[in-house]
Amino acid sequence: MATIKSIKARQIFDSRGNPTVEVDVHISNGVFARAAVPSGASTGIYEALELRDGGSDYLGKGVSKAVNNVNSIIGPALVGKDPTDQTGLDNFMVHQLDGTQNEWGWCKEKLGANAILAVSLAVCKAGAAVRNVPLYKHIADLAGNKKLVLPVPAFNVINGGSHAGNKLAMQEFMILPVGAANFKEAMKMGCEVYHHLKAVIKKKYGQDATNVGDEGGFAPNIQENKEGLELLKTAIEKAGYTGKVVIGMDVAASEFYGKDKSYDLNFKEESNDGSQKISGDQLKDLYKSFVSEYPIVSIEDPFDQDDWETYAKLTAEIGEQVQIVGDDLLVTNPKRVAKAIAEKTCNALLLKVNQIGSVTESIEAVKMSKKAGWGVMTSHRSGETEDTFIADLAVGLSTGQIKTGAPCRSERLAKYNQLLRIEEELGSEAVYAGASFRKPVEPY
């Protein structure tokens, strides 16, 4: 049996110039695997702990403690173990080596979710190589998923919120090519709409409005969220894809939710007089007006991460026609997912491996979501690396959807390009989620 020979971590940099953790795993039979973890800007308060150094170096964002935890604690403890035993290794790291818990489960406060996840991802890649199967196939086998599906890409083409220096409150305006025949065609549609959008924005707001945000989307200095939707609608029309390319939003509403329980759509304005503060119910009605006017199929984080009540109201009212996605609400945490299923809070999971901190717990959250009839969208973070693990994850778990930025910036394209390779490798077996993106496969 091939066993883990050595595990080594180092500090590298993400796409925002912040330190992050990378791990190398060497196996006794000569197999080598490497993985790096991403980092978010608009983070949910219930995410597992991302261990940072504090102090003045790297403005407090160094990860030498997390790196040291891998090199001195996790790595030595995993030497001699079987890299194909993902569940066993993840549980050993999370339950025994770390062991910290809070009301929502294993919180990784001792070793850091960034340390544990980097090892979890690298071990998963090594396990696939030891079994001599592609990573997506290994992940599918770990989850018990028999049918592989290529996801619909959700391209974040207009950036606002915490991802951009404009006044737009809502964070992401996305396009989803649901009418494409395959992933390759979906990329073509997405790229063409993106280029048309650039031309539309340049003509209306000038050259500097086509500067891009952290995820490669444009960040024109508009304030009206509806204007973002209007720009998308126009670009889709100009590209000739009306009806084939639809719209998704990530509002990231926790970013503009105040202590007075209001939502401030003008939260980025320094001389803010509070005139754009609205209640949860008013915001809910605003979404309903958007949905009636534009081809919106997905709304993520429409309310604050603790506003379960308004979430449930929106889901009850428009959940049939639009998926309501929990990101900050759920933080890929199986306990929070279970609560949301029971309370009918939302009807889709945003899958971010670094919110929970291990491959095994991520698979658990996805399986629960699918059994409840939910949609699942695999996601990058705004601070990314060139690592492509989530592309294989989306196919292996048949999530049906992936968002990993605009078709711009190499750390975003790395994932989309990997999906093109996977589709090519699957050949005639390749299935594209398309219009079935909310339920691409039966629960497994």
UniProtKB/Swiss-Prot annotation:
UniProt cofactor note: Mg(2+) is required for catalysis and for stabilizing the dimer.
GO molecular function: magnesium ion binding; phosphopyruvate hydratase activity
GO BP of this protein: glycolytic process
Enzymatic reactions: (2R)-2-phosphoglycerate = phosphoenolpyruvate + H2O
SUPFAM superfamilies (alphabetical): Enolase C-terminal domain-like, Enolase N-terminal domain-like
Record: active site: E215, K352
Keyword field contains Disulfide bond: no
PROSITE patterns: ENOLASE
Top-level EC class: lyase
Binding residues annotated for Mg(2+), in chain numbering: D250, E300, D327
Compartments where located: Cytoplasm
Pathway participation: Carbohydrate degradation; glycolysis; pyruvate from D-glyceraldehyde 3-phosphate: step 4/5
InterPro entries hit by this protein: Enolase, Enolase-like_C_sf, Enolase-like_N, Enolase_C, Enolase_CS, Enolase_N
Subunit text: Homodimer.
UniProt family annotation: Belongs to the enolase family.
Name of the molecule in the record: Enolase
Organism (species): Solanum lycopersicum (Tomato)
Organism taxonomic ancestry: Eukaryota, Viridiplantae, Streptophyta, Embryophyta, Tracheophyta
